[in-house]
C-alpha cells in the first residue's frame, strides 16, 4: 500500500509542477485538476493504510 502512496505522491508533484509553473500552457487547467485528483487519491491511500494497521511494504 505504501508503494501506491508513493506513486500518487510523485504523480501529484509532477502534475503540480506542470500545472502551476506555466510549462503546460493551455493544459494548465487540466494539470491542476489532475494534481488535486491525485492528492485526494494519496490521502485515501494513506487513510486505508492507517485503518488496516498493517506495516507498510516497500
From Swiss-Prot:
Pfam families: DUF1328. GO terms for cellular component: plasma membrane. The keyword Transmembrane helix applies. It comes from the Bacteria. It is a multi-pass membrane protein. It is found in: Cell membrane. The chain crosses the membrane at residues 6-26, 28-48. Keywords: Cell membrane, Membrane, Transmembrane, Transmembrane helix. Belongs to the UPF0391 family. This is UPF0391 membrane protein Shew185_1413.
